[in-house]
Amino acid sequence: GGKCTVDWGGQGGGRRLPSPLFCCYKPTRICYLNQETCETETCP
């Protein structure tokens, strides 16, 4: 697994986490476990 981390800078920036199946979106802190979802979802 992995841990959702949102301590990077920027507003509303979607960043992929070190784990290939994790990504987070700011500012709503939505985490996705599916890489395809990470790539297709627009950042809030």
Curated annotation (Swiss-Prot):
Tissues/organs with expression: Expressed in flowers but not in leaves, seeds or roots (at protein level).
Keyword entries, A-Z: Antibiotic, Antimicrobial, Disulfide bond, Fungicide
Transmembrane segments: none
Intrachain S-S bonds: none
Post-translational modification remark: Disulfide bonds.
GO biological process terms on file: defense response to fungus; defense response to Gram-negative bacterium; defense response to Gram-positive bacterium; killing of cells of another organism
Functional summary from the UniProt entry: Antimicrobial peptide. Active against fungal species B.cinerea (IC(50)=5.2 uM), A.niger (IC(50)=2.6 uM) and B.sorokinina (IC(50)=5.2 uM) but not against F.oxysporum, F.graminearum and P.debaryanum at concentrations below 10 uM. Inhibits growth of P.infestans at concentration between 1.3 uM and 5.2 uM. Active against bacterial species P.syringae, B.subtilis, X.campestris and C.michiganense.
Name listed for the protein in its UniProt record: Antimicrobial peptide 2
Native source species: Taraxacum officinale (Common dandelion)
Lineage: Eukaryota, Viridiplantae, Streptophyta, Embryophyta, Tracheophyta
